[in-house]
Structure formats: C-alpha cells, structure tokens
C-alpha cells in the first residue's frame, strides 16, 4: 500500500509506503531480473553478432540471443547462477516506511522471489562455514537518501563467476590515466573466460577504498553503452573498450573480437595521496530491474 498526505497546510507532502508493498515488489523484481534480459543487452548481442568475425563467436552470440528469448517466454532463469541479490535503494526524504523494518522487508522479498520463482539458492550465511541459507538471503543493500517522496528499488542479481574476477588497486597519483588503463586491461586479461564473456566492465576511479568499489558496481547499472557525461571519461571508456576487445578473448573465451559489450566508468573526488581504481566485471547476463514506489 502506498498513500500520500500533507502534514500541514502548505507543508511537506509525506508518502507512506507499507513494507507489504515492498516485499511484493522485491519478490517480483527477483524473478523479472532473472527471466527478462534488458533490451539494451539484447541489442548489444545482436550488434556484436553482426560484427563478430569468429564463426565460433557468432555461434555463441546466437545461442545467447536464443537463450534470452527462451528464458523470457518460458519464465525460467537465463543462467543457472541466479545471483546474489544486490539491492540499490533511493529513499526519498519525504517517505515514511510503515509495517516493519525496511531491510527485513527487502530480505523477505528476496526470500519469496527466489522460492516462488524456483531460483537457485546461492548464498551461505557464514563465509567460512559455508552453510547455505536456503533462501538466497541475506541480500546486499545499498541505500541513498534523495530529495522527494518516492522509493526507487533497483535489484541486480550478481553471479559469482564474474564477481570473483573483479579487482581493486590503490594506485599512486603519478600512475595517472595510463596506470588506470593498464590495471583495467590486465584485470580483464587475467579474468580470461572465467566471467563468461562477452562482459560488461564497470570501473570506479577515486574516492576511498570502499567508495571506489561502489562506483564500479554502480557503473554496471548504466544503460549499456551510455557514455559518461564527462568528455575525458567518455574518451577513456572508448579507449578501454577498444583495447579490451583487442585481447581476442571472445565470447565464452573461445576467441573473437567480442570480449566486452561495454565499458562504463564512474568517478569521484580522491585524496591527494591516492588514486583508487576498481574493476567490477559483469557476465553477459547483465541483469537489473527497477521499480519506483
């Protein structure tokens, strides 16, 4: 349930959102993200198919297109790894949550979505004891407070294979843009076939250790191929895209010119002594769906 009211005449408009609605929407997003690949990714597959010179690579890209179509039509996961539920919340400062704890509601939505959608349960409760929680919780939840009276929920299931190939390095400021490029390209090269290419490469530059990693993760949420608003960063994205595709890793690591579908770079201010760089790799199943309440 979602309802709005003014707290006083001419005052701030407060929207109340019940956790029952949040649970329902998160459960839906879990399934939708795993069943329906974004149109931007499908178009990138088709473009890559037309440009790929390797017959093996073309065959794999055709299979990926067909696989995505079957998943959508039959409402089954496009990949057996249905991912860690990574949730991004943009919580309007004029929103009131009622009916329980917001984070508990998110986790209950994930629990229901993965259970009712027969999605693989991939999460262990303790990283060393390795006992599966059996319901794909806990989710990873990132919250940003923003102006307004809406709650935006973005759900991005993240597979283990591509996440394992991600990396972060604290460069020296003197390393500059060439140092950044070298690290990104080396990370992709070392990953080879493991993240199930063609990949999407999210890069974070600046901030602190944890902010840099977050930037790289957020870069993966951008519509595929959408350029940075900063001309120098857009140029860097283009250069990295070209260099990565020269590596010849190709679709599923079997050779070809399509190693990456896109490179997205996000930046933030940095300390005078630091140049943090993070690379978060996404497999070809670039899944994320959103809703605004």
Describe the role of every protein-language-model region.
Residues 1-13:
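N-terminal amphipathic/basic-hydrophobic helices that include classical n-h-c signal peptides
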Residues 10-293:
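Non-transmembrane, aqueous-exposed alpha-helical and coiled segments at domain scale
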């Amino acid at each position: 349930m979602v309802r709005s009211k003014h707290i006083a005449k001419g005052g701030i408009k407060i929207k109340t959102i019940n956790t029952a609605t949040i649970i329902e929407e998160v459960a839906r997003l879990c399934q939708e993200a795993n069943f329906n690949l974004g149109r931007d990714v499908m178009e990138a597959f088709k473009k890559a198919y037309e440009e790929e010179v390797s017959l093996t690579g073309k065959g794999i890209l055709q299979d990926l297109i067909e696989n995505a179509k079957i998943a959508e039509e039959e409402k089954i996961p496009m990949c057996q790894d249905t991912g860690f539920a990574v949730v991004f919340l943009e919580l309007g400062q004029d929103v009131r949550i009622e009916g329980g704890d917001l984070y508990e509601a998110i986790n209950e939505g994930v629990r229901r979505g993965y259970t009712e959608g027969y999605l693989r349960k991939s999460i262990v409760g303790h990283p060393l004891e390795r006992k599966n929680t059996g319901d794909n919780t806990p989710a990873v939840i990132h919250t940003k407070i923003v102006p307004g009276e809406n709650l935006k929920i973005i759900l991005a299931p993240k597979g283990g294979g591509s996440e394992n190939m991600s990396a972060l390095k604290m460069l020296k400021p003197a390393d500059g843009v060439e140092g950044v490029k070298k690290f990104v390209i080396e990370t992709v090269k070392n990953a080879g076939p493991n993240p199930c290419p063609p990949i999407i490469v999210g890069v974070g530059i600046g901030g602190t250790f944890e902010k840099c990693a977050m930037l790289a993760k957020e870069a993966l949420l951008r519509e595929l191929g959408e350029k940075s608003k900063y001309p120098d960063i857009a140029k860097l994205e283009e250069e990295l895209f070209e260099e990565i595709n020269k590596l010849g890793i190709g679709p599923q690591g079997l050779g070809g010119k399509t190693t990456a579908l896109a490179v997205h770079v996000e930046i933030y201010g940095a300390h005078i002594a630091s140049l943090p760089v993070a690379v978060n790799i996404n497999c070809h199943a670039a899944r994320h769906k959103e809703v605004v309440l």
